[in-house]
Curated annotation (Swiss-Prot):
<dbReference type="Pfam" id="PF01566">
    <property type="entry name" value="Nramp"/>
</dbReference>
<feature type="transmembrane region" description="Helical">
    <location>
        <begin position="131"/>
        <end position="151"/>
    </location>
</feature>
<dbReference type="GO" id="GO:0005886">
    <property type="term" value="C:plasma membrane"/>
</dbReference>
<feature type="transmembrane region" description="Helical">
    <location>
        <begin position="35"/>
        <end position="55"/>
    </location>
</feature>
<dbReference type="GO" id="GO:0005381">
    <property type="term" value="F:iron ion transmembrane transporter activity"/>
</dbReference>
<keyword id="KW-0410">Iron transport</keyword>
<dbReference type="GO" id="GO:0006828">
    <property type="term" value="P:manganese ion transport"/>
</dbReference>
<feature type="transmembrane region" description="Helical">
    <location>
        <begin position="255"/>
        <end position="275"/>
    </location>
</feature>
<feature type="transmembrane region" description="Helical">
    <location>
        <begin position="418"/>
        <end position="438"/>
    </location>
</feature>
<keyword id="KW-0813">Transport</keyword>
<feature type="transmembrane region" description="Helical">
    <location>
        <begin position="382"/>
        <end position="402"/>
    </location>
</feature>
<feature type="transmembrane region" description="Helical">
    <location>
        <begin position="357"/>
        <end position="377"/>
    </location>
</feature>
<keyword id="KW-1133">Transmembrane helix</keyword>
<feature type="transmembrane region" description="Helical">
    <location>
        <begin position="68"/>
        <end position="88"/>
    </location>
</feature>
<comment type="function">
    <text>Probable metal transporter that may participate in the control of iron homeostasis.</text>
</comment>
<keyword id="KW-0472">Membrane</keyword>
<dbReference type="InterPro" id="IPR001046">
    <property type="entry name" value="NRAMP_fam"/>
</dbReference>
Length: 518
């Protein structure tokens, strides 16, 4: 009996199954079990939205504007859910992560620049985590910040050592750290009791009133979208088994979307709690003059006083544990992102501890120098500089992601719909425009108001403004460059595999037909 391309021989009796995918469907687990098996990548990724850099911008937004900027967090995390789902879908459909696709798509000089920028983004994201961990050790054990920074250089290696027992166990530990941090801030919020009506108004009614509201909202939005996260999410999803059938890939994409939604909802609640606590305490009518001075320039190391009136001496411990969980868990994701960036662009695979040591060694140098010379205030300013670098980096990860996920050459029949494409590009360029505005205004403001001699500022301007022009040209190039390289998707690979299986089945069936009857 002949067997067609879409047929396969199954069982001892030679029963023919008309659709290869139907055989896989017979063995499927319940949907909820398959969903649970895909939990992990979203929680790893959501840590970037809970890192010490985000905590600092949240604290300042609450202190300066109470609850008025909560809507920025809501919009930012909705956009984050969209682009993170695009990143996950890209990995699921193509079987490759973003760094690998960039390496294959772009010319040598372009992909070299993208690799260097991606590495810089990983290092810049590690600086707030190192400093935040140093502040946490300072609060918990009363050691100098620079000593805490040194300890932070090696502490994450202990957590990464869990990977030898399996990635899933490391993901469980990371998820526990997320919930520890969330629990700390929810406890804080329940104690200070911000007015619910004002919190809801701030969350759903956009307002930009008061001095500095625009700048603080830009800082909030810029701190939410991390470029290294886009490389990370597209790679983490590859650790799960993905069926090559169209239905199987859609199911997996849906699972990752739901999981990312849950993880980012937790991140939203934590960010709301941080802003609400800061806004409630710093805008209280009975605030002491000493605390009012702290609220005027709120930083990570000075924020434990927010709970002093209700928790006493234990406020520093609760806040320190939350800050430590934030710094340590965020560092793990940065290490993974750096490894995938290096492997994707250069085909170099490094051990986790070695990759962490390399990234941390580079990030710890400026953190250590600044914390020794400038103390806590200098370390806080370094966090702001690192956030500016990440804002600068964003287009060089976001634009390739938007182009690849909308390309029929990369995604085939699974490419984004015209509505998702339009919505993603509009939101993407809004974020990019905001980041460029934030970066340029900060640079121009610094040039106009620093204490350097006039001729030094002129030289800085001569160097910086051509670089800014080059930056804009690079963004335009990435946006309008035609997508040229076509990839064979999982679905096309499966189709070829089905053809081969059908040919083998045909040969087997022919051999059976030639055998004399018993």
């Amino acid at each position: 009996m002949g067997v067609t391309k879409a047929e396969a021989v199954a069982g001892d009796g030679g029963k023919v199954v008309d659709d290869i995918e139907a055989l896989a469907d017979l063995r499927k687990e319940p949907a909820w079990k398959r969903f649970l098996s895909h939990i992990g990548p979203g929680f790893m990724v959501c840590l970037a939205y809970l890192d010490p850099g985000n905590m600092e911008t949240d604290l300042q937004a609450g202190a300066n504007h109470k609850y008025e900027l909560l809507w920025v967090i809501l919009i930012g995390l909705i956009f984050a859910l969209i682009i993170q789902s695009l990143s996950a879908n890209l990995g699921v459909v193509t079987g490759r992560h973003l760094a690998e696709l960039c390496k294959t798509e772009y010319p040598v000089w372009v992909k070299t620049c993208l690799w260097l920028l991606a590495e810089l983004a990983v290092i810049a994201s590690d600086i707030p985590e190192v400093i935040g961990t140093g502040f946490a050790f300072n609060l918990l054990f009363h050691i100098p910040v620079w000593t805490g920074v040194l300890i932070a250089g090696s502490s994450t290696l202990l957590l990464l050592g869990l990977q030898r027992y399996g990635v899933r166990k490391l993901e469980v530990v990371v998820a526990l750290l997320v919930f520890v941090m969330a629990g700390c801030f929810f406890v804080e919020m329940s104690i200070v009791k911000p007015p619910v009506n004002e919190v809801l108004q701030g969350l759903f009614i956009p307002r930009l009133s008061g001095p500095g509201a625009t700048g603080d909202s830009i800082a909030l939005l810029g701190a939410l979208v991390m470029p290294h996260n886009l490389f990370l999410h597209s790679a983490l999803v590859l650790s799960r088994n993905t069926p090559a059938s169209a239905k199987g890939m859609k199911d997996v994409c849906r699972f990752f979307l739901f999981e990312s939604g849950i993880a980012l909802f937790v991140a939203l609640l934590v960010n709301i709690a941080i802003i609400s606590v800061s806004g409630t305490v710093c805008n209280a009518t009975n605030l002491s003059p000493e605390d009012a001075v702290k609220c005027s320039d709120l930083t990570l190391d000075s924020s434990s006083f927010l709970l002093r009136n209700v928790l006493g001496k234990s406020s520093a411990t609760v806040y320190g544990v939350a800050l430590l969980a934030s710094g340590q868990s965020s560092t793990i994701t940065g290490t993974y992102a750096g490894q995938y960036v290096m492997q994707g662009f250069l085909d170099i695979k490094m051990k986790q501890w070695l990759r962490n040591l390399m990234t941390r060694s580079i990030a710890i140098v400026p953190s250590l120098i600044v914390s020794i010379i400038g103390g806590s205030s200098g370390a806080g300013r370094l966090i702001v500089i690192a956030s500016m670098i990440l804002s600068f980096e964003l287009p060089f990860a976001l634009i390739p992601l938007l182009k690849f996920s909308s390309s029929s050459n990369k995604m085939g029949e699974n490419k984004n719909s015209i509505y998702i494409v339009g919505f993603s590009w509009v939101l993407g360029f809004v974020i990019i425009g905001i980041n460029i505005y934030f970066l340029s205004t900060k640079l121009v403001g610094w040039i106009l108001h620093n204490a350097l001699p006039t001729f030094a500022n002129v030289l800085i301007g001569i160097v910086l403004f051509p670089l800014m022009l080059l930056y804009v040209v690079a963004v335009i190039y990435l946006t309008f460059r035609k997508d040229t390289v076509k990839f064979v998707s999982r679905r096309e690979l499966q189709a070829g595999d089905d053809t081969e299986k059908a040919q083998v089945a045909t040969c087997v069936a022919d051999e059976h037909s030639k055998e004399p009857p018993v």
